[in-house]
Design a protein with these regions (language model features):
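Hydrophobic, membrane-inserting alpha-helical segments
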Residues: 1-12
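Cell wall/extracellular polymer interaction/catalysis modules
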Residues: 14-173, 177-195, 201-202
Length: 202
């Protein structure tokens, strides 16, 4: 598989990796030897297209003792990465690597609408089911279906097959809807105590 390597982002130092969560913490290592979350998603950016960034991901579920009980794999497609622009709103670039919580639509709506009501504004109705929370400089970063870099302004598009198109020097993913539904079912089944995503790269 060919890779589009122009504008490949600068690799951070080990200190930056540790600070931003590329060195992943496994559940079960807190003071009570119990997991802080039920699901951990580890995503590693590996391929860079003209308008896209592609990661492999593994979502792992843990029980109350911190033992692995289930897992699933797939791809995420994001927009082209440029870490100088990653924290700029509406930049149409992949978000900054690091560790984030994934929260359901209802939780984010409740937070947003509390602020809107205080201002006397009408409630907002969010479009997607799951969101990546508190992304620096960005808002509305969701996980939803799609095919290529034109289908995302920063969101993560899951899929189960990756294709590189030489003529446009870019990537597409396939079966996004079915992979999205599989991932969301995984979140609903195992993520009642929380979901964390670690985004890193090679």
């Amino acid at each position: 598989m060919a890779n589009y390597l122009n504008n490949t982002p600068k690799v951070p130092s080990l200190f930056e990796e540790a600070m931003l969560g590329r060195i992943y913490d496994e559940p079960g290592e807190n003071e009570n030897n119990k997991p802080k979350t039920n699901v951990v998603v580890n995503a590693t950016r590996k391929w860079y297209g003209k308008k896209s960034t592609v990661s492999t991901f593994t979502a792992t579920a843990y029980n109350e003792q911190g033992e692995k009980i289930d897992s699933m794999k797939g791809y995420f497609l994001e927009p082209h990465v440029n870490y100088d622009s990653a924290k700029i709103a509406n930049s149409d670039k992949a978000i900054m690597y690091g560790t984030y919580n994934i929260i359901p639509k209802a939780e984010l709506e409740e937070r947003i609408n509390k602020q809107r009501r205080e201002r006397g504004d009408e409630d907002a109705n969010l479009r997607f089911d799951w969101y990546v929370d508190k992304v620096p400089g960005r808002s509305g970063i969701a996980i939803h279906g799609g095919r290529d870099g034109d289908d995302t302004l920063g969101c993560l598009l899951p899929g189960d097959t990756l294709e590189y198109k030489e003529q446009v020097q870019d990537y597409t993913i396939k079966n996004s809807k079915s992979k999205k539904n599989e991932l969301f079912d995984f979140f609903k089944q195992y993520g009642k105590q929380g979901i964390k995503i670690n985004i890193g790269f090679k």
